[in-house]
């Protein structure tokens, strides 16, 4: 469940960023203003869950040529399991087509100019972000008034959100190049184009998403070489370890502080403002280090020893086929497209760390506002601020709020959102008319009536090769048991903050996502067998049951005889 502050912030951010992107593509200001309804509704909040309003994403694609192809590419990138066709390509008259030519030319010129200069733009974006990031003195936020904190938030809106177009344009580039490479593979008759394409994308160096994991592995090596420190790490609770280490090993304590300073905002659920990060609680960092210590063979040297092998095998399969069937010139074009896709994915993953840190800055600002509102008796506790919307915080500061008794508003919201935690919603559904009026949000099935709990085989999309036979560990939050020790990590979705858990997993299976989602990219970088897009995965599989997963075919076979007894117990309980 996502809190009102996170949703209202994300919704405003999407509007701001995509509005600037339309302007960058040369769309006339009058047209941008005419599409405010679309821009304000890129996201939806249903029973506390954030959804894409996919029709408005389709409408955004209408600003680009080749709607059908771009629609298909976007669906593949997002991992949509049931695309819809409520938004169709526009059938224009000759006069309308002529009138639209200048806009199309501006969009194409702007887009492809940026595609050609993407590395330079990414470098400039990262420099810009680093300057703004360092301008915020996080350790001094407590010295600012509520008004000054609101002004700082608005300043970041102007300096960051209104200059976030490079990541969006690069996402378009990823979408288009991924579709283009996929069509190349289909053209030469590759039997499993998704699998081969995943292997072609593996072994990519310079992906910053894996740097936190690699730094933790170096820290783990330091612990292994210091037996007294290792004994302390293994014998103390995660919540007190930072204080224990401070008095025991100054050098390692500094390593911990450096990690928190660099990657303290990178945590599970990092795109929720209400998430507790390493800056507030370092427990997750030590849980990961203990996981690493439990696997004596886990080092940087052994982390991804098979990556180059799978990539080379895929290249040895594809390159001769392309040349034999399409010629040497086509092979050159294919190599160029593949290289562009690899670069675009690397750039996307590296810019995502900037997104993580941006959320961290806003999180600290709003948390301090909560501290002060609590101090002045306007909220019962500081974290109640996450049950206000961004506009309500701004309006309270500006003197235009329609409800100034904040705590009664928070109490009603907390009760409502607590009830949402027990709601089980599908990953997509249709609505008709007013969204919150008479819509059941039960598409494509109602409840669990069509979920086959007895299924012996499940199928998703393979992301990285390997056959693993092991117990599964269902993990949904940092509060769950995180000790994997070779077990298969199963969850609904992941974000970049999950990456440190991956090296100790025997395999990774994610209910939602695509071959371009973060879990797939990092699994390829770390060389871990992975499957994504498995419908109802976490409803069907039971924690600790034994399965066999195939990262090539995307198949999952249930092996544990205990499954039958677990199912019997569930049936008797119901």
Task: Go through each PLM region and give its residues.
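Residue-level recognition of conserved structural "scaffold" positions that shape functional pockets
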Residues: 55, 384, 437-440, 467-469, ...
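A residue-level detector for conformationally permissive "hinge/kink" positions
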Residues: 346, 369, 425, 452-458, ...
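Acidic, glycine-rich flexible loop/linker segments
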Residues: 1, 472-488, 492-574
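Mature hydrolase/peptidase catalytic cores and their serpin-fold inhibitory cores, especially
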Residues: 424-486, 490-500, 508
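Surface-exposed loop/turn and secondary-structure junction residues enriched for glycine/proline
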Residues: 348, 361, 381-382, 388-399, ...
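Contiguous hydrophobic, helix-prone segments at protein termini
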Residues: 4-457
